[in-house]
């Protein structure tokens, strides 16, 4: 007679056997699911900075208006500007979700007073387009920080990890492309284990879920 443990292990083995080929096939088609281009987002960010200088509100408005006017992205952009706190990896800041789907997210993240933390090790490439202020990053073995001023891009490659810091006020257009759902665990961990700020967690869940489901209904994975 089989034990509960052996039965569970068989279930896991069958599940992996079924899911692994599906994940592999989806991975091969990943590029076809994207509607945003990281190079275009960088160009758009630098244009907004050139026009609006240190006026972060105007920079963000410029970027969102341009994305709403672009035929390729207009229907995938959130309808309203909703800000929530985000605690992840020990860092804290404000977050405005412009787009969220299974394979991409585009947000404004930042703070007016500075923050520092762990980037997380993610299942997506993450592009931080710095809009105002600076972002610093550090990897073990180096003796100098990586410094990313306004107008630059900090590319955190999929599966890599760094310490990062926004030493003072800093805001970034953050674009992730890859598998987004596994990243949500990192986004919720601090709230569930440290801050216990359940109203913020609920608001984040509502906005993220609404955007992801809405885009799925449009056929956007």
Curated annotation (Swiss-Prot):
The keyword Transcription does not apply. It is an enzyme of class 5 (isomerase). The keyword Iron does not apply. It is found in: Endoplasmic reticulum membrane. Keywords: Endoplasmic reticulum, Isomerase, Lipid biosynthesis, Lipid metabolism, Membrane, Steroid biosynthesis, Steroid metabolism, Sterol biosynthesis, Sterol metabolism, Transmembrane, Transmembrane helix. Its EC number is 5.-.-.-. One of its GO terms (cellular component) is endoplasmic reticulum membrane. GO terms for molecular function: isomerase activity. It holds the Pfam family ERG2_Sigma1R. Pathway: Steroid metabolism; ergosterol biosynthesis; ergosterol from zymosterol: step 2/5. The chain crosses the membrane at residues 5-25. It is a single-pass membrane protein. GO terms for biological process: ergosterol biosynthetic process. Belongs to the ERG2 family. This is C-8 sterol isomerase. It comes from Pyricularia oryzae (strain 70-15 / ATCC MYA-4617 / FGSC 8958) (Rice blast fungus). The lineage of its organism: Eukaryota, Fungi, Dikarya, Ascomycota, Pezizomycotina. The gene is ERG2.
